[in-house]
């Protein structure tokens, strides 16, 4: 079943088409460090983009981080994601792994990634290999370092804005003197720290030589893209993003820009920036050498788009983010499940439940949570196969727990349907219940069909065994352990037919 694009997706696609139409056969201008006006343009139009050159990062940290990347790669911990874009399943050219606070998730392109926990104080995590444990510890150390650097950069930016000056450098080399930025009141200081409170890092890997096809950058003619133009999703508003880049060539092999070459050097990895939907301001293509870091501060991620332009060597990156986790942690979804199940009075040995209330608002909330845990958590997790077991078993017990709570919610739905069908229920009460639940049951049926089809798709069948999508929860029609069938078509049709006078379209 093809998903209908959201209004936001349709608007974004329309903007893209309009921009391409305006361009016709011409390229927009962009600048590289070879251009005289490059740094001036960066300062004027991209002041919230900061580059820390590799020489300004401690050498021992470089060594640890680069070893950690290679260790995770050796253990097969990077995975290409089967993502959903405008109703189509696509395999990302970049392989990824999410590391971060225990129980956190990060959602992008309709895909929820689950953290391999880094070893924060008070948490106990069992890793499959000692090398994986050491790597997670290293990325926590890098996170702490980048957090300090980000706070410094945000303070510099705030001072610049307060003083109304343009003196803050956008590119900082190893000899740049780090000076105190003066005083901030408590609220300003807290705000800056919160905007740098990275709770996850999304690690990326790509070897361009093993990718038979990469898209060409469509607006500026910048060459092959590893990652298309985008805003990073699912972040706390105005929070920073910090990126550590590691391309695998040795320092002696790094290519210097050829002054005779027009545009960016295609052998070198770059990050591209442009102001969203602006065809007047030149874009930037910033070369990324081994160990360089860049920072997107304040609202830059909202007002600008960025892309990653492929070079020749394999490249890793660690992208540190303040993920918007208000609805994306294990604690959150467990609390939601408990809220839904507060309406259960008793549960019999055979799984039948009795409910405390048939108030429509209570039933609607329960069915909403039922859908949330099934489609935002269980199916998202199992769609990624057994990939997380390569690193840790941290999510195994929580997923078993969530599945048990979800199964109780199946019993709740069954109890609601029994009430709807019970003789003697006043027509008005029956209609109120149906108005509360039928749209949610219809959504559940449609999404189950969609997820089942995604798991069976041709592209899903090409994945390695440990990454093959699993349609879970799934059960056959005559499974005695389940109160309701997997396929709700007949139930939805029955309810619609029996109560067809209700305004279901609403």
Curated annotation (Swiss-Prot):
* Disulfide links within the chain: none
A GO molecular function term, named singly, is: broad specificity oxidative DNA demethylase activity
Q: EC number(s) of the enzyme?
A: 1.14.11.-, 1.14.11.53
Residues annotated to bind Fe cation = 230, 232, 306
- Could you say which cofactors this protein requires? Fe(2+)
Query: So what family is this one in?
Result: Belongs to the fto family.
Note describing how the cofactor binds: Binds 1 Fe(2+) ion per subunit.
Region Fe2OG dioxygenase domain, annotated ranges: 32-326
Encoding gene per record: FTO
* One example of a Gene Ontology biological process annotation: RNA repair
Any one Gene Ontology cellular component term annotated for this protein: cytoplasm
The protein's location, in the record's own words, is: Nucleus; Nucleus speckle; Cytoplasm
| N6-acetyllysine: modified positions | 215
> What name appears for this protein in its UniProt entry?
Alpha-ketoglutarate-dependent dioxygenase FTO
């Amino acid at each position: 079943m093809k998903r209908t694009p959201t209004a936001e997706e349709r608007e974004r696609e329309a903007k893209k088409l309009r921009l391409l139409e305006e361009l016709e056969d011409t390229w927009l201008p962009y600048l590289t460090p070879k251009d005289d006006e490059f740094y001036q343009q960066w300062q004027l139009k991209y002041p919230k983009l900061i580059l820390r050159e590799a020489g300004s990062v401690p050498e021992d940290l470089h060594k640890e981080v680069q070893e950690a990347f290679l260790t995770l790669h050796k253990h097969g911990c990077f995975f290409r994601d089967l993502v959903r874009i405008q109703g189509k399943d696509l395999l990302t050219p970049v392989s990824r792994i999410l590391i971060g606070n225990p129980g956190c998730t990060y959602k992008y392109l309709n895909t929820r990634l689950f953290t391999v926990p880094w070893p924060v104080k008070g948490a106990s995590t069992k890793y499959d290999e000692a090398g994986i444990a050491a790597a997670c510890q290293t990325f926590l150390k890098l996170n702490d370092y980048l957090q300090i650097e980000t706070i410094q950069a945000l303070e510099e930016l705030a001072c610049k804005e307060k003083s109304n000056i343009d003196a803050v450098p956008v590119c900082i080399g190893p000899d740049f003197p780090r000076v105190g930025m003066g005083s901030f009141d408590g609220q300003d200081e807290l705000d800056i720290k919160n905007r740098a409170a990275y709770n996850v890092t999304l690690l990326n890997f790509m070897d361009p030589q093993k990718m038979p096809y990469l898209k060409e950058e469509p607006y500026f003619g910048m060459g092959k893209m590893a990652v298309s133009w985008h805003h990073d999703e699912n972040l706390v508003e105005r929070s920073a993003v910090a990126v550590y880049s590691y391309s695998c060539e040795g320092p002696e092999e790094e290519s210097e820009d050829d002054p005779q070459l027009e545009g960016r050097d295609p052998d070198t990895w770059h990050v591209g920036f442009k102001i969203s939907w602006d065809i007047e301001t030149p874009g930037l293509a910033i070369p990324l050498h081994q160990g360089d870091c860049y920072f997107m501060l304040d609202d830059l991620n909202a007002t600008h788009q960025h892309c990653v332009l492929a070079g020749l060597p394999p490249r890793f990156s660690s992208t540190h983010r303040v993920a918007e986790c208000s609805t994306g942690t294990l604690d959150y979804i467990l609390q939601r499940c408990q809220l839904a199940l507060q309406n259960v009075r008793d549960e019999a040995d055979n799984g039948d439940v009795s409910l405390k209330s048939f108030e429509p608002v209570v039933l609607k909330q329960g069915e909403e949570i039922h859908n949330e845990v099934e489609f935002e958590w269980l199916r998202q997790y199992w769609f990624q196969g057994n990939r997380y077991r390569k690193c840790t078993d941290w999510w195994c017990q929580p997923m078993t727990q969530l599945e048990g709570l979800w199964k109780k919610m199946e019993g709740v739905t069954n109890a609601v349907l029994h009430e709807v069908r019970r003789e003697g229920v006043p027509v008005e009460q029956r209609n109120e219940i149906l108005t509360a639940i039928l749209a949610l049951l219809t959504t559940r049926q449609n999404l189950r069909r969609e997820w089942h089809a995604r798991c069976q798709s041709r592209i899903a069948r090409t994945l390695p065994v440990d990454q093959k999508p699993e349609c879970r929860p799934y059960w056959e029609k005559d499974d005695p352990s389940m109160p309701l069938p997997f396929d709700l078509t007949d139930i939805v049709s029955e309810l619609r037919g029996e109560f067809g006078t209700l305004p279901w379209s609403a």
